[in-house]
Amino acid sequence: MAQSYVGQKRIRRYYGKIREVLEMPNLIEVQKSSYDLFLKSGDGPKAADGEGIQGVFQSVFPIKDFNETAVLEFVKYELEKPKYDVDECQQRDMTYAAPLKVTLRLIVFDVDETTGARSVKDIKEQDVYMGDMPLMTANGTFIVNGTERVIVSQMHRSPGVFFDHDKGKTHSSGKLLFACRIIPYRGSWLDFEFDAKDIVFARIDRRRKLPVTTLLYALGMDQEGIMDAYYETVNFKHQKNRGWVTRFFPERVRGTRPTYDLVDAATGEVILKAGEKATPRMVKKWIDEAQITELLVPFDHIVGRYVAQDIINEETGEIWVEAGDELTMEYDRDGEVKGGTLKLLLDQGITDIPVLDIDNVNVGPYIRNTMAADKNMGRDTALMDIYRVMRPGEPPTVEAASNLFDTLFFDSERYDLSAVGRVKMNMRLDLGKPDTQRTLDRDDIIACIKALTELRDGKGEIDDIDHLGNRRVRSVGELMENQYRVGLLRMERAIKERMSSVEIDTIMPQDLINAKPAAAAVREFFGSSQLSQFMDQTNPLSEVTHKRRLSALGPGGLTRERAGFEVRDVHPTHYGRMCPIETPEGQNIGLINSLATFARVNKYGFIETPYRKVVEGAVTDDVVYMSATEEMRHTVAQANAQLDEEGRFVSDLISSRKAGEFMLNPPDAIDLIDVSPKQLVSVAASLIPFLENDDANRALMGSNMQRQAVPLLQSDAPFVGTGIEAVVARDSGAAIMARRAGVIDQVDATRIVVRATEMLEPGEPGVDIYRLRKFKRSNQSSCINQRPLVKVGDVVHRGEVVADGPCTDMGELALGRNVIVAFMPWNGYNYEDSILISERILRDDVYTSIHIEEYEVAARDTKLGPEEITRDIPNVGEEALRNLDEAGIVYIGAEVQPGDILVGKITPKGESPMTPEEKLLRAIFGEKASDVRDTSLRLPPGAYGTIVEVRVFNRHGVDKDERALQIEREEVERLARDRDDELAILERNIYSRLRTLIMGKTAVKGPKGIRAGSEINEDLLSTLSRGQWWQLALGEEADAKEVEALHEQFEAQKRALDHRFEDKVEKVRRGDDLPPGVMKMVKVFVAVKRKLQPGDKMAGRHGNKGVISKVVPIEDMPFLADGTHVDLVLNPLGVPSRMNVGQILETHMGWAARGLGIKIDEALQDYRRSGDLTPVKEAMRLAYGDETYEGAFGDREDEDLVEMAGRVTKGVPIATPVFDGAKEPDVNDALRRAGFDQSGQSIVFDGRTGEQFARPVTVGVKYMLKLHHLVDDKLHARSTGPYSLVTQQPLGGKAQFGGQRLGEMEVWALEAYGAAYTLQEMLTVKSDDVAGRTKMYESIVKGEDNFEAGVPESFNVLVKEVRGLGLNMELLDADEE
C-alpha cells in the first residue's frame, strides 16, 4: 500500500515531563469568532440578542417621522455572495466584501383629525442595498484596497462603577479624597467625589461639580427620603432631670473608654464608670447575661445630633425642625438657656426625638453636611442647576431641564451600560438587576453614593483599575459594530428629514434611504482607524502575533503620553491571560501586549485562562476557564507541582496563589491547578527553548526579533525546538492542510489535486484542488512561496500538511537555519556583538532570501489628451528599450538595473507656438514626437533584480494590447486545465461507482447490439463506451433508481463545474474597475536574491543580536579535529552580562542533536553496505530514548524506518517546552550519548595557521535568524538630486534620494581642525549656493578644477526673515567702503 504521508513526518524527542491535558486552541480564534458573531447575528434563534449587525439595526430602527404618520421598520438582513474572491481582490486592488441587503418595511398611518387615533393605511416592504460589508479571509485578515490588513483587539476600561482615591495628591494635608465613577459603554459619565471638607459632589461628563444632594433632589427625593436612604434612625426619649433614654450599641463601646457613666436605663445601675475601659468580656456579658438594650445618657448628649424627620405641629402644620437640622442649645452670658432648636422642641412638650445615627467614628455626617451646604431644596431648582451646568448660557425652563436630565442617564438611545456594565455594577454594589436593563435608575445612584460614603468611613476597598477583571477586550466584531452604529445614526437623521419632506404615500423604502453614510463609516474604519493595521507579514509567526495583539491605544483608549507606569506594568491577573514578556521596547512598552497561548476571550470581553479542577487533593482532567474576577476566589497550584501516579500532590505544602498573592498551602486547600507550564507566555515566547534560563529583558527581545526573521530560500526546522512549531505553522495558514482525507492524484509546483475519499457534505465534488502560491509578494516585500510535500499516490488524512509555505519545513515553523557556532574572539572582528561568518554560508545559500518589489504605472486621461503605454518613446536609444516587448512592457525574466525602463509611457505636453517651418514639416511628415514627454516607469536607484510577473489592467471598453491578451490566454488555459482535471477525476469516480452498481445485474434493455436480459459483466461493458453505460436499463426498480440518482448527481456536478468555469473566464475577460481617469494600469514585480553580507543583522532566539562584520574564506575559519569548519564565530562576552544562558544550553543541545544525527547517518551507510538494519535501529534508539522509540518507530516497516532515519541524519530534532524542558542533566546525557565531552567544549584549530587554540572552545549548533534589517535597504549614496524649495539645500533621507546632513557639531569639528576650504565647500557649493554649484558641475564636466563659492541661499532666507520682522538689512561690499 502507498505510504501515508503521516509516517514521513520528522519525529521530535520530547523532553516535557508534564502531561498536556488540553489541546492548544486555534491561535487566531479571537479574530474569527468575534467577526463571525458580528456577521451571522441574524442567523438562528439568538437573533434578538442585540449583538452584531442584527443588534445595530434593531437599536436604530424603527425610524419615525417627526409627526409620527409613518414608520420605517427593520425586518431582516442578508449578506450576498462576494463579487470577487480573495486572490482576485488582491490582484485588482479591491476590497474583499459582500453586498449587504436589508429588508425594510414602511408603514404609513392615517391619523384621525378629531380623535387623534391612528390606523394603518399602507404597508410596503422592500430589499434595500446598504453598501458592502468587508469579509474576513480564512486566516483572520481583511483585504482592503488589495492589501491585507488586521484589526487589532483593543483593551479598554470595562463599563461599570469604579471607586478610587486621589492618593492624597489633591490636598496639601495628604488627606485621601475618595471618588466614584460610573462609566457606561456609551453615554455621559457620572462622577461622585469628596472634597477636602468632606462634602460629596457629583459631576456629569467632567463638568462643573454640583452638591450630590442636587442630583438626589432631581431624582425626585426629598430631604427626609435622602436622610432615610443613608442613615439609620435612633430615638431619644426624654426623662425629666435624668437625661435621655436611647438604644445601646455594645459593639461600639468595646475597647473604648467612655467619657460618661454608662447607666442601664431599665435598672438605673452604672455598668461602667467614666474613663474605665470596656473589655470584650464585659461587652459579651452585657449582651448575653444582662441583656441591656437601652442606656440612660446625660442631657447634653443629644446636643449636636441631627433630627431624622421633619417635626411638625400637628394642628397648624407649622414645621418646627426639618430633617437634617442640628439640635442646638443657645446660652446667654449667665449660662441660662435662651434658645436653640432643642429648647424649642422641649418647650412644645416633645419628649421623643428621632435622631440620625451619626457618631462621627463609624458613620460620618457627609450627606447631611452636603445637604446643609446645598442651596437647592426641591426638584425644580435642582433640575435647573443641572441644566445650567450642562448647557451654560441657555435660559433654563423646568420642562427643558427635566427632559435633558431624563435623556442623560435614563434613555436607552443615549445611554447604554451594556450587559458587561450591568453585570459589573451588580457585582460591585450587590444589586440584582437583570442584564437587559442597560440604563441607570435611582437605586443605582443611591447605592453608588452609599458605597462611596462607606469607603470614607473605612469600610470596603477601592478598585484596582489595572486588574484584568476591570479591563476588557474589544475585538473586531465589536469595534465594527460600534462603527456601523455611528454610520446608521448619521443615516437616521437624513431619513427623518426626507420622510417629512416628501409625499410619503407614493414612495418606497428605497427612496428614503441613502446608504452612503453607513458605507463610508465602514470604509473609514478599515482604511484609517488606528486599530486597522497593515498586516505584519514578514513571516508566519509575525502574522499570528499580529492577530493576537492587544492594544491599549486607539479611539476610546489611552494615549502614549498619558499612560503612566501602573497601566504598563505586569499585574498578577496577567497570569495565563496576557504575556508578561512579549511587548515592544520603546514608548509603547506595556501598552501593546500579546494574548497568552491558552487564553480566550469570553462573551463579555474578559480574558479567560484554563485550569484543571482539583478535588480533595486529587487533580482531575476537568478543565474550567476562569476570568480574573472568578479566579480571585480560588487557590491555584502551579503546573509543575509534583503529582503521583493517581494525580495526588506529593508534598505537604504546595506553592500556590490566591487573590494575587503567593503562598504555601496544604493539598486539600487547593481548588485548581494550571493546565500547562506555557500557559503564562505568548506564542512567540513559547517558541524560545530554555526560556527559563534567560533574563526577562532578553527574552522580550528574543520574542520580538523572531517576528522579524526573513523567510529564507531553504527553510530548516530547529534541532532544538519547543514542540509548538507545528501548531504555529498550522494556525498561521502558511502551510496547506488537507481539507479532507484522500489520495494524491496529481502534483506539480503550482497545485495539488486530491481525490477525496471522505465526504464532509453530501453532493460536494470528490476533488480538492489546492492552488499553491508561487513567489508572491508579502506586505513586507518578503517572498511567499509554497512547495508540495506529497507524491502522487500518497494517502493523506484530514488536517495533514500537504505543502510547506514560507518559513515552514515539513509542517513546522522554521524561521532560520541550524549553523555551527563557536564562542571565541577572532581578531577583534566580533567586538560589540559583531558576527563573523564563513564563506560557506554564501556558497551554499544558507541565508539567501528572495525579496519581491512591486512597481505600478497608470496611463491616465489628461486635459491635453490620453497618456499612452508604448515602446515608442522620444529621445531614448534602442539599448534602453532592449527589455521591452512591442506593447512597451518589460519581458518576464529580464534582468534589470537602476534606471532601466520597466514600462514605456508618454504623456502629451502643452502645445508651444510653432514657426511656419515647423508647421510645414508637421504637415509633410506627420511628425508628432515633439508634443509628448517621456514619463516611463523606471527602476528606482538601489533596486535591481529579475522580472517575475507582469499584470495589465484595462478599463471597460479600452482595446487590450497584445501583452494583455497573452496574459489573459494563459489565465484561461490554467482555468480550463483545472476544470478538465476536476472533470476527469469526477468521471473516474462516478464511473467506478456505476460499474460496482451494475456489475452482475441483468439488463432489461440497452444500446444497439445488447440483448434484453443479458447479464452485465466485464466483456459486455468493454464493448460499450462509458457514456453508453447509462443506457443499460436494470430489471430491479431500486437499482434503476440508484443509477438514475447517480446520473443526476453526475450531471449536476458537471453543470456546476461548467458554470464556475464560465463565471471565472468571464471575470478574466471583463474589463477592470480602475480608479476614475485611469485608462490602463500595469504592475511589474521584480525579485532579487539577497545573500548574507556585512552589515546585515542576525539574531538568535534569546535576544542575542548582532551585525555581520566580515566574511572569512572557509579555509581560514576555525576547525575541529575532524576537519569540520565553524560557520559563525560569536563573542563569548555577549553572554555573561546579558544573562541569557539559554543560548549556551541550546548550543550544547544542538551539538548533541547533530552528533546523534551523524551516528544515524553512519548506521545507515552500514545498512546500505551490509543490508543489516540492526545498527540503524540501535542508533535510532540511542537518539530517541526507549520510550519515544517504541512509541514512534516500534511497529514500523523496515523501509519506513530507513526513510525516517534518513530524515534526521543532519540532526535529531528535540522539543524542550518552556518551563518544563530539558535540565542540565538531560543536556549532559545527550552530549554523552552523542559521544562528546560533557563540558560541551571542543579542541579547535586556527584555520590560518593550523595551530591549536590555547584552550577548548564552546562549539555547538545554534538556530540563527536573518532579520529584516538588510544593509541593501539602508545603504544609499547621492551625487546630485532634488533640493528643498525654500532653503535650496539637498533633501534628507533615502526615500527622497537625499544627501548626508552636515550638522552644527560637524561644522565645529571642521573649524577645530582649521579645514577652512573644506568647510567653505561644504557650506556653499556642496549645499545651497545655487550659482556656485551649477558652475562647479559644469567645470567638473569640462574637466577643469576652478570654482568659486558665492552666497548660500540660506543667508538670503535669513535676510528675508529679518525683513519680515520689519528690520531692513542692506549688504555692502567691502570694496565700496
UniProtKB/Swiss-Prot annotation:
Which cysteines are cross-linked by disulfides? none
> What domain of life is recorded for the organism?
Bacteria
Q: What is this enzyme's class at the first EC digit?
A: transferase
Per its record, the protein catalyses: RNA(n) + a ribonucleoside 5'-triphosphate = RNA(n+1) + diphosphate
Q: Name one Pfam family in it.
A: RNA_pol_Rpb2_2
A Gene Ontology biological process term? DNA-templated transcription
Q: Does the keyword Transmembrane helix apply?
A: no
The UniProt keyword set, sorted, is: DNA-directed RNA polymerase, Nucleotidyltransferase, Transcription, Transferase
- Gene3D superfamilies xref list: 2.40.50.100, 2.40.50.150, 3.90.1100.10, DNA-directed RNA polymerase, beta subunit, external 1 domain, DNA-directed RNA polymerase, subunit 2, domain 6, RNA polymerase alpha subunit dimerisation domain, RNA polymerase Rpb2, domain 2
Q: Which GO terms describe its molecular function?
A: DNA binding; DNA-directed RNA polymerase activity; ribonucleoside binding
Family matches, as HAMAP family: RNApol_bact_RpoB
- What the protein does? DNA-dependent RNA polymerase catalyzes the transcription of DNA into RNA using the four ribonucleoside triphosphates as substrates.
Q: How does it assemble?
A: The RNAP catalytic core consists of 2 alpha, 1 beta, 1 beta' and 1 omega subunit. When a sigma factor is associated with the core the holoenzyme is formed, which can initiate transcription.
- What this protein is called in its record is DNA-directed RNA polymerase subunit beta
